[in-house]
Amino acid sequence: MFTPQSISQRSNGLHFKRPVTYKTTMLHPVMSVSSRSSQEESLMTVGESVSSLSMQEQQTESDTDASHSDNEENDNVDSVSNFDNLSNSIHLISLNEVDELLEDHQSTIQSSLNRGLTCTNLPDHSIKSGVTRSTVSTVRPTSKQHHQPYKYRSLLLPFEPSRGSRSMRRKIGGSRGSSLASVRRIFRSTHHLQPHKDLNSLPHEIMSKIVSHLDQRDVTMCLYVNKNMYSTAVRQLYKEPFFSSTYRFAQFVTQVSHNDELASYVQKLDLSTIRPGFESDEDDSAIFENEPIEDDAVLAGWRDWKLRGDPLYSRQFKRLTKHVSNSSSSLSCSRTSSNSNSSTESKPVKKRRSVTTAIRESRIWLSFYKKNKLYQASEEVLEALRKQNSPLVRPKVPFSTAHPISSPFLRQYSTSKDVPVGHLIHVVAACKNLTDIDISFLPLAEDYAVAGSSSYLPTASSGLLFVSDVAKLYTWKPDEIVPVSPSDLVVAMLQLRDLQVLKLRKLMWVKRDSVVRLVNENNSLVHLDLTDSGLVRGARWAIAGSVEELRQTLK
């Protein structure tokens, strides 16, 4: 018996013919051809040629096999005879013949490719002791070089990527180009979910930094934007307030002395910019004489704010008295005209005509304004307002009203810009975060503190009450008031723990004792300006410098 191993050893390069299956596939079904029948006919011819060649080669191969086995004839005569019988039944062929058959079949495949047909899975042949599988891959006829036959056939098979690898290559190749588009798509999809960014979303510190670069007029306009801007603008306005008159400063004192939150915002107090109520290049004696002066030329001062509730000193009372005087004069004229001649009777008639003419003109102007105004209310809005019985109220606009005008009874104080000592003590006692104070060129008006025995009670948060706070015109009793001096203001400044800069230039009420207390008792003070201050001109301590320099000067 012969085992397969002995048969393979005795083959010596012979190739066994095994049953073969052929398959044909079409890469691109470009035309409908009966390829199945044609392929079967071509494969039948190939099989017959292979079998005929194997019969012719049988004799030559058996002779070569006998020549190689001369040394083993004595031992294996029976095995050779049996092997010859087996080879005759198996039909052996050589490798050269197989290569020629493959080349012929390759040309047949190329001709079939030209017709749009492809052939795959050619028969597998075992070569010698090893097994090698050779398959003819289908090549897509995309160019002319694929149709030209090659002179030498390569042992390396061409790589044809599968459908999965092609899709992966497209994904990898297109990932670079589509990465930016995908990021944009994700951003657009999530952008509508993010809240809209505006000034209200900024932190309070950033908003304060932005508003700090605006002037006072622009900061005042920010009060009318919204609540968030209002809170930021209020902090900035009270942080470094600016005063143009003593009337505005009196309003500020009333606010901070009754509101601790607003008082905590104040860090810098500058009163050196305050101007008098009346400024004229000519002689100021015209104010005290009977020369006519326009009412709008004199601005109100702190005394007008103090007496704002008194109808005698308020502007409303003045307008009321002016209207009453005009009506009484017209009545007296009408009474006298009834007892006079016809020439005098024509005067009130002319006045009535002028009044009716003015009324008629005003009505015409009103109708013209309603017809041509820019914004007209709809009928629904007007109907809703009629049902509510509420008048149309125009919103307040900043800087729409001018500075208040001084009362004619207080015109004698219009050239002065003095400030009562009680007002300054109120501010220093309420604003505990002050770091910079400048009251240069500011004269102080004498003031009195109201004692507890009086019927007036303090309303300020500090518990202080001064005569400058009470609208009282009659004389105070001696036991109801206590005089207040500038030295009391210095004592109040000593309580400020954050005060660093103090400017007291050209102030006659500054004394050496007050300067000594400021330098020695206030530890936070860094800079002090006393230029041209004091009753004595050219005093040694009336200089501007650091606290250490003033200490050396005062020794």
Swiss-Prot record:
InterPro entries: F-box-like_dom_sf, F-box_dom. Residues 196-246 form the F-box domain. The keyword Nucleus does not apply. Keywords: Ubl conjugation pathway. SUPFAM superfamilies: F-box domain (SSF81383). The keyword Transmembrane does not apply. Residues 48-61 have a biased composition (Polar residues). Residues 32-42, 129-142, 327-346 have a biased composition (Low complexity). Residues 31-82, 124-147, 327-354 are annotated as: Disordered. CDD domains: F-box_ScMDM30-like (cd22143). Disulfide bonds: none annotated. F-box protein probably involved in ubiquitin conjugation pathway. This is F-box protein COS111. It comes from Yarrowia lipolytica (strain CLIB 122 / E 150). The lineage of its organism: Eukaryota, Fungi, Dikarya, Ascomycota, Saccharomycotina. The gene is COS111.
